From Swiss-Prot:
Keyword line: Ribonucleoprotein, Ribosomal protein, RNA-binding, rRNA-binding
Keyword Nucleotide-binding: no
Assembly and binders: Part of the 50S ribosomal subunit.
Taxonomic source organism: Alteromonas mediterranea (strain DSM 17117 / CIP 110805 / LMG 28347 / Deep ecotype)
UniProt-annotated stretches for the region Disordered: 44-66
Gene Ontology molecular function terms on file: rRNA binding; structural constituent of ribosome
Keyword Ribonucleoprotein: yes
GO biological process: translation
Main function: One of the primary rRNA binding proteins, this protein initially binds near the 5'-end of the 23S rRNA. It is important during the early stages of 50S assembly. It makes multiple contacts with different domains of the 23S rRNA in the assembled 50S subunit and ribosome. Forms part of the polypeptide exit tunnel.
Protein name: Large ribosomal subunit protein uL4
Amino acid sequence: MELTLKDAQSALEVSEATFGREFNEALVHQVVVAYGAGARQGTKAQKTRAEVRGGGKKPWRQKGTGRARAGTIRSPIWVGGGRAFAAKPRDFDQKVNKKMYRGAIKSILSELIRQDRLVVVEKFGVDAPKTKALISALNEYELNDVLIVTPEVDENLFLAARNLYKVDVRDVAGIDPVSLIAFEKVLMTADAVKQLEEALA
């Protein structure tokens, strides 16, 4: 299949297997949820009765005082005691096979093409790290809510986009399923498309 280059009177030949797949909503959902779960810190922690400092001595004898029996001042029903069901650090990571991850990205790319949300150009960049220059370049393609994907890190582009709310710049190695679906449009250079196609092959 062919992708039309917006800044040239030509087309880019790409693989049907990568850019012409049927959209697998269940797979994309699973991978996106796993990606979000993996981003969670999971660093909450509380102390159980065994972990709270102190409480080694029985506060009073078992019988004869008229008071309720007690074995430690760190019981969960005491003020200053441990937590009955204490929260512990947890790893929220979900396993995603490489084949599934690649399949989800291919599925998203194919859907972006069907929805006319993927813009492919021969070259894209700015001469200086100026936001004004980037806005001007994006206006040529009528883009304002966009993910820009380049073959490698472009420092000028990255610095120029830092101050724009709905613009992000990634190299091919830095894209993920969430970033691909988070923006209204995805702008890719021809070299980035080819590099991504090789990575997903």
